[in-house]
Amino acid sequence: MRFVDEVVIKLQAGKGGNGCVSFRREKYVPRGGPDGGDGGNGGSIYLKADENVNTLIDYRYKREYYAENGRPGEGRNCYGKAGEDLYLVVPVGTSVFDIDTNKKIGEVLQHGQTFKLVSGGKRGIGNTHFKSSTNQAPRKFTLGEEGEYKEVRLELNLLADVALLGLPNAGKSTLIRSVSEATPKVADYPFTTMYPHLGVVKVGVDSFVMADIPGVIEGAAEGAGLGLRFLKHLTRARCVLHVVDICPFNESDPVENYFAVEKELEKYSQELFDKPRFLVINKIDLLADKVEQKCQEFVEQIGYQGNYYTISAAMKKGTDELAKKLNEFLQKQE
């Protein structure tokens, strides 16, 4: 299924039903009083989060949504039926932005959580309500109000504990495959990963969610490559793994590659740049000798002061230990 994380839709809540003008007419009661009932309220439209949904693709092809109108009131003080509410099912982590103001107006972050997008119109009232001592046979009633209309943008930000960051072909997809049951495409060419993937990493009785996004290239913060579109999925992660290919097949410099990604991350969002971040040196199986020494030299060259991990995602070397350390970090954050 294609991954879609941003759509624009139009919403029209239901109109309220009109009030009714009616008078009681029964045998032996030829001039009964007013008995016109109220109309029904118009239906509203809600977002509803579902953990089993992971894309907004359904809203790419259908862009307009209408809630049901309320029914008009009837005689004998019968109220009209309220319009049925409409629920739009979306992935957990979906935010809503008003197109006119471009402001965020809501979000759904937990399974089953709802958020009202537009409100149904208020019902009209029947002539029963207008009876008075001076007007025993009122013909006055009110119309139901129009339902609210709004055009909104839905944006999905994946909810993950750990996000993978790095250049294309750094081995991020191989890493998430090696520690979870996620199955992103893996190949020896850049941009194999076209859309984000989530994987659940299990460590004993604990588990956490890891996200793999398309690789970042120079200029991503300005929209180059696929990076800009998907960097937003890192914003809700609790920590970021910067995955570096220590032995690039294109013979590029790992040091320059590291700083290129760090530069784009800082340009895109200072908040994201300040998140807890760990260095993962990948593809150590491709180093002919002195693996530990070469990795240490790389760390010194980039001036990295934090914890770092050396792995071969393809050979699953060091990946279990990495998963354990990440789980320990996440447990301490709770």
Curated annotation (Swiss-Prot):
An essential GTPase which binds GTP, GDP and possibly (p)ppGpp with moderate affinity, with high nucleotide exchange rates and a fairly low GTP hydrolysis rate. Plays a role in control of the cell cycle, stress response, ribosome biogenesis and in those bacteria that undergo differentiation, in morphogenesis control. This is GTPase Obg. Residues 160-331 form the OBG-type G domain. It is found in: Cytoplasm. Residues 1-159 form the Obg domain. Its EC number is 3.6.5.-. Transmembrane segments: none annotated. Mg(2+) binds at S173, T193. Monomer. It comes from the Bacteria. Coiled coil: none annotated. PROSITE patterns: G_OBG, GTP1_OBG, OBG. HAMAP family: GTPase_Obg. InterPro entries: G_OBG (IPR031167), GTP-bd (IPR006073), GTP-bd_Obg/CgtA (IPR014100), GTP1-OBG_CS (IPR006074), GTP1_OBG_dom (IPR006169), GTP1_OBG_dom_sf (IPR036726), OBG_GTPase (IPR045086), P-loop_NTPase (IPR027417). The gene is obg. GTP binds at residues 166-173, 191-195, 212-215, 282-285, 312-314. Gene3D superfamilies: GTP1/OBG domain (2.70.210.12), P-loop containing nucleotide triphosphate hydrolases (3.40.50.300). The lineage of its organism: Bacteria, Pseudomonadati, Pseudomonadota, Gammaproteobacteria, Thiotrichales. Keywords: Cytoplasm, GTP-binding, Hydrolase, Magnesium, Metal-binding, Nucleotide-binding. One of its GO terms (molecular function) is GTPase activity. Its cofactor is Mg(2+). GO terms for cellular component: cytoplasm. Belongs to the TRAFAC class OBG-HflX-like GTPase superfamily. OBG GTPase family. One of its GO terms (biological process) is ribosome biogenesis. It comes from Francisella tularensis subsp. tularensis (strain SCHU S4 / Schu 4).
